[in-house]
Amino acid sequence: MNKFEDIRGVAFDLDGTLVDSALGLAAAVDMALYALKLPIAGEERVITWIGNGADVLMERALTWARQERATLRKTMGKPPVDDDIPAEEQVRILRKLFDRYYGEVAEEGTFLFPHVADTLGALQAKGLPLGLVTNKPTPFVAPLLEALDIAKYFSVVIGGDDVQNKKPHPDPLLLVAERMGIAPQQMLFVGDSRNDIQAAKAAGCPSVGLTYGYNYGEAIDLSQPDVIYQSINDLLPALGLPHSENQESKND
Protein backbone atom coordinates (compact mmCIF):
# COMPACT_ATOMS: atom_id res chain seq x y z
CA MET A 1 0.00 0.00 0.00
CA ASN A 2 1.31 3.45 -0.95
CA LYS A 3 1.32 5.54 2.23
CA PHE A 4 0.75 8.64 0.09
CA GLU A 5 -2.23 7.36 -1.90
CA ASP A 6 -4.67 9.64 -0.06
CA ILE A 7 -2.65 12.81 -0.59
CA ARG A 8 -4.75 15.68 -1.97
CA GLY A 9 -2.23 18.52 -1.56
CA VAL A 10 1.46 19.14 -0.93
CA ALA A 11 3.12 21.84 1.16
CA PHE A 12 6.80 22.72 1.29
CA ASP A 13 9.26 24.42 3.55
CA LEU A 14 11.37 27.07 1.79
CA ASP A 15 14.94 27.52 3.08
CA GLY A 16 16.96 24.33 2.73
CA THR A 17 14.10 22.58 0.92
CA LEU A 18 13.31 24.57 -2.22
CA VAL A 19 16.06 27.16 -2.03
CA ASP A 20 19.66 27.44 -0.90
CA SER A 21 19.50 30.76 0.93
CA ALA A 22 22.60 30.38 3.09
CA LEU A 23 24.75 32.82 1.11
CA GLY A 24 22.26 35.68 1.38
CA LEU A 25 21.36 35.00 5.00
CA ALA A 26 24.99 34.76 6.06
CA ALA A 27 25.91 37.96 4.24
CA ALA A 28 23.09 39.88 5.95
CA VAL A 29 23.92 38.44 9.38
CA ASP A 30 27.60 39.32 9.00
CA MET A 31 26.86 42.85 7.80
CA ALA A 32 24.56 43.38 10.78
CA LEU A 33 27.17 42.06 13.22
CA TYR A 34 29.88 44.19 11.62
CA ALA A 35 27.69 47.29 11.95
CA LEU A 36 27.58 46.65 15.70
CA LYS A 37 31.36 46.13 15.80
CA LEU A 38 30.94 42.45 16.62
CA PRO A 39 32.82 39.47 15.12
CA ILE A 40 31.37 38.12 11.88
CA ALA A 41 30.22 34.51 11.81
CA GLY A 42 30.65 33.22 8.25
CA GLU A 43 28.36 31.05 6.14
CA GLU A 44 29.23 27.65 7.64
CA ARG A 45 28.29 28.81 11.13
CA VAL A 46 25.18 30.73 10.07
CA ILE A 47 23.85 27.61 8.34
CA THR A 48 23.59 25.92 11.74
CA TRP A 49 21.37 28.76 13.00
CA ILE A 50 18.81 28.76 10.17
CA GLY A 51 15.28 27.42 10.61
CA ASN A 52 13.47 29.16 13.45
CA GLY A 53 12.82 32.58 11.95
CA ALA A 54 14.76 35.84 11.93
CA ASP A 55 14.35 36.70 15.62
CA VAL A 56 15.87 33.41 16.76
CA LEU A 57 18.56 33.76 14.10
CA MET A 58 19.49 37.14 15.60
CA GLU A 59 19.53 35.72 19.13
CA ARG A 60 21.87 32.92 18.07
CA ALA A 61 24.10 35.31 16.15
CA LEU A 62 24.34 37.78 19.03
CA THR A 63 25.01 35.08 21.63
CA TRP A 64 27.83 33.64 19.54
CA ALA A 65 29.29 37.05 18.63
CA ARG A 66 29.42 38.29 22.22
CA GLN A 67 31.07 35.06 23.36
CA GLU A 68 33.52 35.20 20.46
CA ARG A 69 34.40 38.81 21.23
CA ALA A 70 35.04 37.94 24.88
CA THR A 71 37.28 35.03 23.87
CA LEU A 72 39.26 37.15 21.41
CA ARG A 73 39.77 39.94 23.93
CA LYS A 74 40.91 37.48 26.59
CA THR A 75 43.38 35.95 24.14
CA MET A 76 44.79 39.41 23.41
CA GLY A 77 45.00 40.25 27.11
CA LYS A 78 42.32 42.92 26.88
CA PRO A 79 39.59 43.45 29.49
CA PRO A 80 36.03 42.29 28.70
CA VAL A 81 33.57 44.76 27.20
CA ASP A 82 30.72 45.97 29.39
CA ASP A 83 27.73 46.29 27.06
CA ASP A 84 25.73 49.43 27.79
CA ILE A 85 22.87 48.03 25.70
CA PRO A 86 20.92 45.06 27.15
CA ALA A 87 21.00 41.88 25.06
CA GLU A 88 17.28 42.13 24.22
CA GLU A 89 17.77 45.63 22.82
CA GLN A 90 20.82 44.50 20.86
CA VAL A 91 18.76 41.70 19.32
CA ARG A 92 16.14 44.25 18.27
CA ILE A 93 18.79 46.49 16.71
CA LEU A 94 20.48 43.52 15.04
CA ARG A 95 17.15 42.40 13.57
CA LYS A 96 16.51 45.87 12.16
CA LEU A 97 19.95 45.90 10.56
CA PHE A 98 19.51 42.35 9.28
CA ASP A 99 16.20 43.19 7.62
CA ARG A 100 17.78 46.15 5.84
CA TYR A 101 20.77 44.19 4.59
CA TYR A 102 18.83 41.05 3.72
CA GLY A 103 16.50 43.11 1.57
CA GLU A 104 19.56 44.11 -0.44
CA VAL A 105 21.11 40.66 -0.87
CA ALA A 106 18.24 38.14 -0.62
CA GLU A 107 17.60 37.67 -4.33
CA GLU A 108 21.22 37.46 -5.47
CA GLY A 109 22.11 35.25 -2.51
CA THR A 110 19.35 32.66 -2.98
CA PHE A 111 19.24 29.81 -5.49
CA LEU A 112 16.83 27.02 -6.39
CA PHE A 113 17.99 23.53 -5.54
CA PRO A 114 18.14 21.09 -8.49
CA HIS A 115 14.82 19.81 -9.90
CA VAL A 116 12.67 22.16 -7.79
CA ALA A 117 10.92 23.96 -10.65
CA ASP A 118 10.31 20.74 -12.61
CA THR A 119 8.92 19.00 -9.53
CA LEU A 120 6.58 21.85 -8.63
CA GLY A 121 5.39 22.04 -12.22
CA ALA A 122 4.68 18.30 -12.38
CA LEU A 123 2.70 18.38 -9.13
CA GLN A 124 0.69 21.38 -10.26
CA ALA A 125 -0.02 19.73 -13.62
CA LYS A 126 -1.38 16.72 -11.74
CA GLY A 127 -3.93 19.04 -10.16
CA LEU A 128 -2.50 19.01 -6.64
CA PRO A 129 -2.76 22.32 -4.77
CA LEU A 130 0.64 23.42 -3.49
CA GLY A 131 1.41 25.40 -0.36
CA LEU A 132 4.47 27.02 1.17
CA VAL A 133 5.15 27.23 4.91
CA THR A 134 8.21 29.18 5.99
CA ASN A 135 9.46 30.84 9.16
CA LYS A 136 11.15 33.48 6.99
CA PRO A 137 9.77 37.00 7.63
CA THR A 138 6.71 37.44 5.41
CA PRO A 139 7.84 40.62 3.57
CA PHE A 140 10.77 38.74 2.02
CA VAL A 141 8.80 35.71 0.83
CA ALA A 142 6.70 36.92 -2.13
CA PRO A 143 9.49 38.94 -3.81
CA LEU A 144 11.85 35.99 -3.49
CA LEU A 145 9.36 33.54 -4.99
CA GLU A 146 8.74 35.94 -7.88
CA ALA A 147 12.45 36.45 -8.50
CA LEU A 148 12.98 32.69 -8.63
CA ASP A 149 9.91 32.26 -10.88
CA ILE A 150 8.16 29.77 -8.58
CA ALA A 151 5.42 31.97 -7.10
CA LYS A 152 3.06 30.73 -9.84
CA TYR A 153 3.02 27.23 -8.38
CA PHE A 154 1.61 28.06 -4.94
CA SER A 155 -2.04 28.59 -4.07
CA VAL A 156 -1.28 29.16 -0.37
CA VAL A 157 1.78 30.88 1.12
CA ILE A 158 2.30 31.27 4.87
CA GLY A 159 5.25 33.35 6.05
CA GLY A 160 6.72 33.72 9.50
CA ASP A 161 4.64 36.80 10.32
CA ASP A 162 1.32 35.31 9.18
CA VAL A 163 0.79 33.14 12.25
CA GLN A 164 1.37 33.63 15.95
CA ASN A 165 3.11 30.27 16.33
CA LYS A 166 5.82 29.31 13.84
CA LYS A 167 7.06 25.80 13.04
CA PRO A 168 7.59 23.44 14.85
CA HIS A 169 4.11 24.42 16.09
CA PRO A 170 1.44 22.80 13.88
CA ASP A 171 -0.59 25.99 13.35
CA PRO A 172 0.99 27.04 10.01
CA LEU A 173 0.44 23.59 8.50
CA LEU A 174 -3.10 23.35 9.80
CA LEU A 175 -3.84 26.76 8.27
CA VAL A 176 -2.53 25.67 4.87
CA ALA A 177 -4.60 22.48 4.93
CA GLU A 178 -7.68 24.49 5.90
CA ARG A 179 -7.16 26.93 3.02
CA MET A 180 -6.67 24.01 0.64
CA GLY A 181 -9.95 22.56 1.87
CA ILE A 182 -8.42 19.22 2.82
CA ALA A 183 -7.79 17.31 6.05
CA PRO A 184 -4.27 17.51 7.54
CA GLN A 185 -3.71 13.81 6.88
CA GLN A 186 -4.36 14.49 3.18
CA MET A 187 -1.57 17.08 2.96
CA LEU A 188 2.00 15.92 2.47
CA PHE A 189 4.59 18.21 4.02
CA VAL A 190 8.11 18.29 2.59
CA GLY A 191 10.98 19.77 4.57
CA ASP A 192 14.64 19.50 5.46
CA SER A 193 14.73 20.07 9.21
CA ARG A 194 13.70 18.87 12.63
CA ASN A 195 11.24 21.78 12.85
CA ASP A 196 9.51 20.68 9.65
CA ILE A 197 9.06 17.08 10.71
CA GLN A 198 7.94 18.00 14.22
CA ALA A 199 5.37 20.41 12.79
CA ALA A 200 4.08 17.75 10.38
CA LYS A 201 3.73 15.18 13.14
CA ALA A 202 1.96 17.64 15.43
CA ALA A 203 -0.45 18.59 12.64
CA GLY A 204 -1.12 14.99 11.63
CA CYS A 205 0.42 15.40 8.17
CA PRO A 206 2.54 12.73 6.48
CA SER A 207 6.07 13.99 5.96
CA VAL A 208 9.03 13.78 3.61
CA GLY A 209 12.49 14.64 4.94
CA LEU A 210 15.12 15.81 2.46
CA THR A 211 18.77 15.09 3.19
CA TYR A 212 20.42 18.09 1.55
CA GLY A 213 19.12 20.91 3.75
CA TYR A 214 20.52 22.67 6.80
CA ASN A 215 18.88 21.06 9.88
CA TYR A 216 21.37 22.42 12.42
CA GLY A 217 23.98 19.91 11.25
CA GLU A 218 21.80 16.92 12.20
CA ALA A 219 20.88 14.00 9.95
CA ILE A 220 17.21 14.25 8.98
CA ASP A 221 16.59 10.59 9.81
CA LEU A 222 16.92 11.46 13.51
CA SER A 223 13.60 13.32 13.20
CA GLN A 224 11.92 10.18 11.79
CA PRO A 225 9.96 11.54 8.83
CA ASP A 226 7.66 9.08 7.08
CA VAL A 227 9.99 8.97 4.07
CA ILE A 228 13.51 10.27 3.40
CA TYR A 229 14.60 11.36 -0.08
CA GLN A 230 17.95 12.49 -1.46
CA SER A 231 16.39 14.76 -4.08
CA ILE A 232 13.10 16.61 -4.22
CA ASN A 233 12.02 14.92 -7.45
CA ASP A 234 12.21 11.54 -5.71
CA LEU A 235 8.75 12.25 -4.29
CA LEU A 236 7.11 12.26 -7.74
CA PRO A 237 6.91 8.45 -8.17
CA ALA A 238 5.38 8.17 -4.69
CA LEU A 239 2.56 10.41 -5.92
CA GLY A 240 2.01 8.49 -9.13
CA LEU A 241 4.12 10.68 -11.39
CA PRO A 242 7.21 9.86 -13.46
CA HIS A 243 10.56 10.91 -12.05
CA SER A 244 11.36 14.32 -13.55
CA GLU A 245 14.72 13.09 -14.91
CA ASN A 246 12.89 10.32 -16.77
CA GLN A 247 10.38 12.83 -18.07
CA GLU A 248 13.18 15.08 -19.30
CA SER A 249 14.72 12.12 -21.15
CA LYS A 250 11.42 11.42 -22.91
CA ASN A 251 11.18 15.05 -23.98
CA ASP A 252 14.71 15.17 -25.44
Swiss-Prot record:
Keyword Hydrolase attributed = yes
Q: Care to name a GO molecular-function term for this sequence? A: metal ion binding
Instruction: State the EC number(s).
Output: 3.1.3.18
Q: Which InterPro entries does the record associate with it?
A: HAD-like_hydrolase_sf, HAD-like_sf, HAD-SF_hydro_IA, HAD_sf, PGP-like_dom2, PGPase_prok
| Catalytic residues as annotated in Swiss-Prot or TrEMBL | 13
Which residues are Mg(2+)-binding? Answer: 13, 15, 192
- Any one Pfam family here would be Hydrolase
Q: Which UniProt keywords apply?
A: Carbohydrate metabolism, Chloride, Hydrolase, Magnesium, Metal-binding
| GO BP, sorted A to Z | carbohydrate metabolic process; DNA repair; glycolate biosynthetic process
Q: Where is the signal peptide?
A: none
Required cofactor(s): Mg(2+); chloride
Where on the tree of life does the source sit, at the highest rank?
A: Bacteria
Q: Catalytic activity annotated for this protein? A: 2-phosphoglycolate + H2O = glycolate + phosphate
Q: Name one GO cellular component term.
A: cytosol
> What this chain does, per the record?
Specifically catalyzes the dephosphorylation of 2-phosphoglycolate. Is involved in the dissimilation of the intracellular 2-phosphoglycolate formed during the DNA repair of 3'-phosphoglycolate ends, a major class of DNA lesions induced by oxidative stress.
User: Per the similarity annotation, which family is this?
Assistant: Belongs to the HAD-like hydrolase superfamily. CbbY/CbbZ/Gph/YieH family.
How it assembles, according to the record, is:
Monomer.
Quote the PANTHER family the UniProt record gives.
PHOSPHOGLYCOLATE PHOSPHATASE
Q: What is this protein called?
A: Phosphoglycolate phosphatase
- Native species: Shigella dysenteriae serotype 1 (strain Sd197)
- Organism ancestry: Bacteria, Pseudomonadati, Pseudomonadota, Gammaproteobacteria, Enterobacterales
